[in-house]
């Protein structure tokens, strides 16, 4: 039989008060004596609950503006005391056993995220007593239950009811693991915050505060285990950040279909992040992390139809992302036309879900609408290390573009250039994208030489019978030689958008002028490896 421990006395001290009143009422109704501190104690007393202030229990007042509340032997002795081993010394010093500790910590992350947060504000939101109690209770989980998540309140009450007011060892052990994860994440946030301030903090006035902390502490929560990773011989799991603020594959809800695979998640992320670039109704189809068809239109149905036409062969078994609600007409078009692994959209109508339900293996995800893109960090694992950089949220406006050719682009060429520039950002380097009338007509991805990416984009367009003449071409990085321009001109490209910055820019511009091509510089590169 599981080793059970009855809960007779609980200490409650929480910054996040969500659910605490109901939980305390449930504990009190089951005969549990309540100890509490500061604001939590006042809140419980206001609700008519019998609660003893920790300062009354210890005989020692809170002091130093609340910095010292629970750091007392009567508190920590009651938590750390081993039942059946330390009973005599606890009785000698009038230490009552505390069977449950309910604590969550000062909101450090929320504090430092505020605009204008000072170092003093950050320091005052470093919890000391809370983590100490959490660690003490987790260490002594054989006898004490530590509760750090309000989402566990209901399950705890149900288990107490099923076990005559007791909790099993398995439950206490699971709660202890959550507690150590909680304090580890909390300390990591503090270390990252202070670590990024190291140069300035030590008074090196000529050196700005570091963009990246001296030691990088990462905290991710496992969302799911997977059958396997990128390949069947690799084990895998999906971890997500806590409190993600932007609609993403990590926050998406799966409303139908088989479990997502490792490759499904990677490809869905690529598709969703690409479709976020567009304000108009848009569709992005991705295969092996590369867009194989992208279009914008007046409806997502037409956008899907045009995106599919770019490369129907590659679209088979692909990932489809939209930036508008999935409607019934579009769902029917997809299901009738092709095999698809994943469809992701901000939402899906009931009628659309009835249609996709006919294909139970199709995974349908809804991620919610996004208002803006949230700056963050990108990571790339290398053997023995981690490359860290800012997320690529770089964008260029029409006003920032530089026309460097003799011929100015037409209005349509300019629209197509800006469209395919957005797409090129999400194509593996070397990336070349041909576009015409707000749809991709050829994509050359991942080639070791830029000219071959340009040639492949032209071949793709020809294979699908798409008219290249008068199209725009985007390149994610500069052209090192004129050959890429010559290849584009040979198939009818009339406008090129690229970062510029090559030592041979003059030769490349001259090639554009020779072919009557309008050339636009963005002065921004979008390598993607």
UniProtKB/Swiss-Prot annotation:
The keyword Transferase applies. The keyword Transferase applies. GO terms for biological process: 'de novo' IMP biosynthetic process. It catalyses: (6R)-10-formyltetrahydrofolate + 5-amino-1-(5-phospho-beta-D-ribosyl)imidazole-4-carboxamide = 5-formamido-1-(5-phospho-D-ribosyl)imidazole-4-carboxamide + (6S)-5,6,7,8-tetrahydrofolate; IMP + H2O = 5-formamido-1-(5-phospho-D-ribosyl)imidazole-4-carboxamide. Belongs to the PurH family. This is Bifunctional purine biosynthesis protein PurH. Coiled coil: none annotated. One of its GO terms (cellular component) is cytosol. Keywords: Hydrolase, Multifunctional enzyme, Purine biosynthesis, Transferase. Residues 1-148 form the MGS-like domain. The IMP cyclohydrolase activity resides in the N-terminal region. Its EC number is 2.1.2.3, 3.5.4.10. One of its GO terms (molecular function) is IMP cyclohydrolase activity. Pathway: Purine metabolism; IMP biosynthesis via de novo pathway; 5-formamido-1-(5-phospho-D-ribosyl)imidazole-4-carboxamide from 5-amino-1-(5-phospho-D-ribosyl)imidazole-4-carboxamide (10-formyl THF route): step 1/1; Purine metabolism; IMP biosynthesis via de novo pathway; IMP from 5-formamido-1-(5-phospho-D-ribosyl)imidazole-4-carboxamide: step 1/1. The gene is purH. InterPro entries: AICAR_Tfase_dup_dom_sf (IPR024051), Cytidine_deaminase-like (IPR016193), MGS-like_dom (IPR011607), MGS-like_dom_sf (IPR036914), PurH-like (IPR002695).
């Amino acid at each position: 039989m599981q080793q059970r421990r009855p809960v007779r006395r609980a200490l409650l001290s929480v910054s996040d008060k969500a659910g605490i009143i109901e939980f305390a009422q449930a504990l009190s109704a089951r005969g549990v004596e309540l100890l509490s501190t500061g604001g939590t104690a006042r809140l419980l007393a206001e609700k008519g609950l019998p609660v003893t202030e920790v300062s009354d229990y210890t005989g020692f007042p809170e002091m130093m503006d609340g910095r010292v509340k629970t750091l007392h032997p009567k508190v920590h002795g009651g938590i750390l005391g081993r039942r059946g081993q330390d009973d005599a010394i606890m009785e000698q010093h009038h230490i009552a056993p505390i069977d449950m500790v309910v604590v969550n910590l000062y909101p450090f992350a929320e504090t430092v995220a505020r605009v204008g947060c000072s170092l003093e504000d950050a320091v005052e939101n470093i919890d000391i007593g809370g983590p100490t109690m959490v660690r003490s209770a987790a260490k002594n989980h054989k006898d004490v239950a530590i509760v750090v998540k309000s989402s566990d309140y209901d399950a705890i009450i149900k288990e107490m009811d099923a076990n005559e007011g007791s909790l099993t060892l398995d439950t206490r052990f699971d709660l202890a693991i959550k507690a150590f994860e909680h304090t580890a994440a909390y300390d990591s946030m503090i270390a990252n915050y202070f670590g990024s301030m190291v140069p300035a903090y030590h008074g090196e006035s000529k050196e700005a505060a570091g963009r990246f902390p001296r030691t990088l502490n990462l905290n991710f929560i496992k969302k799911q285990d997977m059958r396997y990773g990128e390949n069947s011989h690799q084990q895998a799991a999906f971890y997500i950040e806590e409190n993600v603020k932007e609609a993403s594959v990590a926050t998406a809800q799966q409303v139908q279909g088989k479990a997502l695979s490792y490759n499904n998640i990677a490809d869905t992320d690529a598709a969703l992040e690409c479709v976020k670039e567009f304000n108009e109704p848009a569709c992005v189809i991705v295969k092996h992390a590369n867009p194989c068809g992208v279009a914008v239109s007046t409806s997502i149905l037409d956008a899907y139809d045009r995106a599919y036409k770019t490369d129907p062969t590659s679209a088979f078994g692909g990932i489809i992302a939209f930036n508008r609600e999935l409607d019934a007409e579009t769902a029917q078009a997809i299901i009738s036309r092709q095999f698809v692994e994943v469809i992701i959209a901000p939402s899906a109508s009931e009628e659309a879900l009835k249609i996709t339900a006919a294909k139970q293996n199709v995974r349908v995800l809804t991620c919610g609408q996004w208002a803006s893109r949230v700056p963050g960090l990108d990571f790339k694992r290398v053997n023995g290390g981690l490359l860290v950089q800012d997320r690529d949220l770089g964008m260029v406006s029409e006003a920032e573009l530089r026309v460097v050719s003799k011929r100015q682009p037409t209005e349509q060429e300019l629209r197509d250039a800006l469209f395919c520039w957005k797409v090129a950002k999400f194509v593996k380097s070397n990336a070349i994208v041909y576009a015409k009338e707000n749809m991709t007509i050829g994509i050359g991805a991942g080639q070791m030489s830029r000219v071959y990416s340009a040639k492949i984009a032209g071949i793709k367009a020809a294979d699908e019978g798409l008219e290249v003449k008068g199209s725009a071409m985007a390149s994610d990085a500069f052209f090192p030689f004129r050959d890429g321009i010559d290849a584009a001109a040979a198939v009818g490209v009339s406008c090129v958008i690229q970062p510029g910055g090559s030592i041979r820019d003059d030769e490349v511009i001259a090639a554009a002028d020779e072919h009557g091509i309008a050339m636009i510089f963005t002065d921004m590169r979008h390598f993607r490896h």
